[in-house]
Amino acid sequence: MVARSLGLMSDLKRTPLCAQHLQLGARLVPFGGWEMPLQYSTLTREHRAVRTAVGLFDISHMGKYTLSGPDVLAQIQRLVPSDLARLQPGQAQYTVLLNEQAGIIDDLIFYCRSPEHWVVIVNGATNDKDRRWLAEHLQGVHFDDLTGTHTLLALQGPAAVETLQPLVDIDLARLGRFEHAQVSLAGKPAFLARTGYTGEDGFEIMSLEPEGIALWQSLTAAGVPPCGLGARDTLRLEAAMHLYGQDMDESTTPLEASLGWVIDWDKPDYFGREILLAQKAQGTERRLVGLTVEGRQIARHGYGLFDGEQQVGVVTSGTLTPTVDRPIALAYVGKPFAPIGSRLEVDIRGRRAMATVVKRPFYRRAL
Amino acid sequence: MALEYPEELKYLDSHEYLRVEGDTVVVGVTSYAVDQLGDIVFVSLPEEGDRINRGDSFGSIESVKAVEELYAPLSGTVLSVNTVAVEDPALIGSDPYGDGWLIKVRLADPADELGETMTAEEYRERVEG
């Protein structure tokens, strides 16, 4: 083995919960410019906690904005392929910011408080880029960046409702998937959304720093296990949720990334629309697929996929997951190899393993 | 988790340990390495009878987080391979100094080759600073 360099931690940003993480024995690693907890106990234990009961994540590194003004809806409609005009107050939409070439600038969630008032949550590593893009393309919109003043916690798992219910003043059973509300949480205001990145039921909770720290402390003291980025990655991959910068970036369009479901084909003009229409008509040359891999070795980011001697694709994310207990991966493959059931070989550091294109997600929770 | 470094072993800065038994040496990875790797899911090792050379890769150890090469701390012939650990790599994580050993090697030259090892105390200072 070789000693691995973890980079210069001193240049990294820390969330307001960093002291809590250290106190809980977290191993901290650099992630997208932030020093973040990788795990507190073990990745497998944290993963299973979220699948079977509940787990708590600090995701305060994510970008958090509010957009307000009379003309907000018309302006944000130009930036995304989803029809945000369909949203009622209290509803949210996962979508992508597109550039003029239909390349994905980021994936993000727009939460509609009202047509004049939106909450937007974006990836931590792309926060600066997104903020610049929005500033450049939104006129007359009041933009408020909450990233530095607010925490964001994710409480995820089948026991999330019963865990959180005693702390809030609304009936959580009445808050549907992807719905959100302004609530009183332990007597303080909080933004509560039934969203997440694990494939489980759960909530994302945004509040001012002191309230976020208090919530973290009260939940962990009550026995909710804190979970790190390691479990977050295996959970999201089982649910076939994409990681920006790894499974998609500005060189991929939503159709190539198998995110066609976020596109409303009838909505008015937006960046990249002509290119998406052309791709829809002609099909894309490559697309993101799910793979299962034979054996126990993990097909990791960057590993090549082969049909005989011809390289026909590349792995973007891979892991061996606690729930499915076999190697799974996301990969871009050429059109002929995208259908379910296609057989390919993945080059794992010089050795070939058979891989099969399978239906995504790899894991789906029982409803 | 409190990490242990048994006194009777010799340690490499690449996080392998050596248990010297006459002219044979048992090679494994330290509890520090195991702790850094996290859940171990796969290990590839040489075959019995293979010749390994000091400094060369003799296999790899893989966790969900990362893959690390295993480097031979000495030159010799592989006498036996821990096939139980190959079948159940979690054993390396749960018992690195016992049932989770990796290979047993007969030294090519018993008089040589073990010069650059550390004692348990030196290794502890190195990894825990």
Swiss-Prot record, chain B:
InterPro entries: 2-oxoA_DH_lipoyl-BS (IPR003016), Biotin_lipoyl (IPR000089), GCV_H (IPR002930), GCV_H/Fam206 (IPR033753), GCV_H_sub (IPR017453), Single_hybrid_motif (IPR011053). One of its GO terms (cellular component) is glycine cleavage complex. One of its GO terms (biological process) is glycine decarboxylation via glycine cleavage system. The modification N6-lipoyllysine is found at K65. Binds 1 lipoyl cofactor covalently. Its cofactor is (R)-lipoate. Residues 24-106 form the Lipoyl-binding domain. Keywords: Lipoyl. CDD domains: GCS_H (cd06848). Pfam families: GCV_H (PF01597). PANTHER family: GLYCINE CLEAVAGE SYSTEM H PROTEIN, GLYCINE CLEAVAGE SYSTEM H PROTEIN-RELATED. The glycine cleavage system is composed of four proteins: P, T, L and H. The glycine cleavage system catalyzes the degradation of glycine. The H protein shuttles the methylamine group of glycine from the P protein to the T protein. Belongs to the GcvH family. This is Glycine cleavage system H protein. It comes from Gloeobacter violaceus (strain ATCC 29082 / PCC 7421).
